[in-house]
């Protein structure tokens, strides 16, 4: 994508933004097909020209007869470049499965179909290329073979269109088939969070660093601040192009080129993400559902090292099977992926897994929590959470993530990331949870939310801690607010806010009493029995008799040299309860004397 100069902006909108990608075996004519459809030769590298194969991703745009414009991604077919194919396929809505009529179904045809299935692609057209090299009888045989191959897959009912890029035969029918299929693509729910997985980075003279990708959710505008994840580096959008046209904003589903202000090309690579500042949190653990492909060749054992491909990233990971020790071919299970480097993902992201060596596609799945903690294997509680996150409704998913977030709670933005629930739907869901007292709002500005059961458990922990303190120090009127907060592990900021809110709610319910900086249970009374009770009565009498000229604290301690510890405790109790009024450090008065 080229970037036009300022002043050449075009008003350019789409009703539905769709990206079509190619798939198929090496040298089956994918690039020639795209060139015939769009006029663009997507093989731009010298090595690609010399070898006659696609190595890197290629991009173009396709104008359909009805006026809709599709983004197009041309992917490599060679087995050595499948990782590039996965990066390109991650953002597509429909696939053009290309099969050469003179060769038929080949190994990468099968592997690419597996990858498209694992990535959740549900629509496509099947293109039989190079028909000028075969006769009609052979073409009919190939067509039947392809139909048999596609049976039971998402392409089973898709149109099969024979074409020749050399003669142009069949291309009108192909355009019509693409247009019909594009109209069947269901518009996915937009989470509202701007996210662009980077699949290409280059430097353009006069403009600087440009990144491209398919905008998976949200929107972005010229001048906005964005963050490069997982680096945490922030920069601004200098310019935007969609299908070679300069625009002010780009929306979910569009192939987009973004010119980044003052950013070195060397710091960005394919697999990084552009997102809103602070919107995404990189993690080295991902909870997921996993399917081991039929025909994967061998069982998947716990802790197997694999190559993980998600959106445009490739990263090494270990598969921790949580519900078994090994997974048969064709089997499904729950797993946690432990990554070798941080990755920013969102619940609902699909992934492909390839074996470490020999490198081949063996499975894939769906991320159900991109920010989990380490789990205990075979835990009934953990497996129940996984089942709810994988199969439950939005309310069940939100409840699990709220509980996992603990007493610190979670912001609405992070809840979107960890559940995959679109922003508007999540806001309605949370309002219902507040009304039903299943969630607690901590801060409306930040939209930080707590699980109601977790919050109730925390209030119970406050009461237990106070009870323990009262039992240990029966002569003390209460525990200092700061000591209680520290004991419960509630730090400054959010922790202090939630702690203060819990104290207020407990006081409102009549369960505790907060007096200045001292906190006590509502039913707590200092109980003085035996000698301590008698000592208190004697101390009270001394102060009553002294009236406005009572002895100093030092003088009283000198009268009871063997009971100074008890006297000091009694001073604390009597001043806390208001019987003695402290005027200065060494002087108290009885309340009846004032």
Where are these regions (language model features)?
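Intrinsic disorder/low-complexity segments
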Residues: 1-14
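Conserved catalytic-core segments of large NTP-driven translation/proteostasis enzymes
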Residues: 137, 148-296
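Conserved Switch II/interswitch segment of TRAFAC-class P-loop GTPases
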Residues: 69, 75-80, 90-113, 121-140
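Conserved nucleotide-binding/hydrolysis micro-motifs of P-loop NTPases
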Residues: 78-79, 102-106, 130-135, 165-169, ...
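Conserved G1/Walker A P-loop phosphate-binding module
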Residues: 11-75
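Conserved catalytic network of the ASCE P-loop NTPase/AAA+ motor domain
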Residues: 26, 53-55, 61-66, 87-91, ...
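Residue-level signature of catalytic and energy-coupling elements of molecular machines
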Residues: 27, 33, 52, 72-74, ...
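C-terminal effector modules of nucleic-acid-centric enzymes and ribosome-associated factors
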Residues: 134-138, 148, 263-582, 587-594
């Amino acid at each position: 994508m080229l970037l036009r100069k300022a002043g050449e902006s075009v008003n350019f909108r789409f009703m539905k933004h769709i990206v079509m990608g190619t798939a198929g075996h090496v040298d089956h004519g994918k690039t020639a097909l795209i060139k015939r459809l769009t006029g663009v030769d997507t093989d731009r590298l010298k090595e690609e020209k010399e070898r006659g194969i696609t190595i890197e991703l290629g991009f173009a745009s396709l104008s359909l007869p009805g006026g809709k414009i599709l983004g197009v991604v041309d992917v490599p077919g060679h087995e050595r470049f499948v990782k590039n194919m996965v990066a390109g396929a991650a953002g597509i809505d429909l696939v053009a499965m290309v099969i050469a009529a003179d060769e038929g179904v080949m190994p990468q045809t099968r592997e690419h179909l597996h990858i498209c299935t694992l990535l959740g692609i549900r629509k496509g057209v099947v293109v039989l290329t190079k028909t000028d090299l075969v006769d009609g009888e052979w073409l009919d045989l190939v067509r039947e073979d392809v139909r048999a191959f596609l049976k039971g897959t998402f392409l089973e009912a898709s149109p099969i269109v024979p074409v020749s890029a050399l003669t142009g035969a069949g291309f009108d029918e192909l355009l019509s088939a693409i247009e019909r299929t594009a109209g069947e693509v269901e518009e996915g729910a937009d989470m509202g969070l701007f996210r662009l997985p980077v699949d290409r980075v280059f430097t353009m003279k006069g403009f600087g660093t440009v990144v491209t990708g398919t905008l998976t959710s949200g929107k972005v505008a010229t001048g906005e601040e964005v963050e490069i994840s997982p680096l945490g580096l922030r920069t601004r959008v200098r310019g935007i192009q969609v299908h070679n046209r300069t625009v002010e904003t780009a929306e979910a589903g569009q192939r987009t080129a973004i010119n980044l202000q003052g950013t070195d090309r060397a710091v960005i690579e394919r697999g990084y993400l552009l997102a809103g500042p602070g919107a995404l949190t990189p993690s080295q653990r991902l909870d997921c559902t996993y399917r081991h492909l039929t025909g994967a060749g061998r069982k998947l054992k716990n802790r197997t090292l694999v190559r993980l491909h998600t959106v445009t990233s490739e990263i090494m990971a270990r598969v921790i099977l949580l519900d078994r020790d090994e997974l048969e071919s064709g089997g499904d299970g729950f797993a946690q992926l432990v990554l070798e480097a941080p990755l920013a993902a969102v619940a609902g992201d699909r992934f492909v897994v390839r074996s470490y060596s020999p490198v081949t596609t063996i499975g894939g799945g769906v991320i159900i929590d991109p920010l989990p903690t380490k789990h205990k294997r075979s835990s009934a509680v953990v497996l129940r959470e996984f089942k709810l996150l994988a199969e439950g409704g939005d309310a069940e998913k939100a409840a699990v993530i709220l509980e996992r977030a603990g007493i610190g709670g979670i912001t609405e933005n992070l809840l979107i990331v960890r559940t995959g629930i679109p922003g508007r739907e999540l806001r309605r869901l949370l309002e219902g949870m507040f009304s039903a007292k299943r969630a607690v709002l901590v801060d409306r500005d930040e939209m930080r939310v707590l699980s109601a059961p977790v919050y109730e458990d925390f209030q119970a922990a406050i009461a237990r801690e106070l009870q323990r303190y009262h039992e240990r120090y029966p002569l003390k009127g209460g525990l200092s607010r700061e000591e209680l907060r520290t004991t419960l592990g509630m730090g400054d900021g959010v922790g202090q806010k939630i702690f203060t809110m819990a104290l207020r709610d407990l006081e409102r319910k009549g369960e505790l009493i907060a007096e200045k900086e001292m906190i006590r249970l509502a039913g707590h009374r200092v109980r003085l029995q035996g000698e301590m009770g008698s000592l208190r009565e004697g101390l009270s009498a001394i102060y009553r008799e002294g009236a406005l000229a009572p002895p100093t604290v030092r003088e009283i301690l000198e009268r009871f040299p063997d009971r100074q510890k008890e006297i000091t405790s009694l001073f604390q109790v009597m001043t806390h309860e208001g019987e003695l009024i402290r005027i200065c450090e060494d002087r108290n008065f009885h309340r009846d004397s004032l």
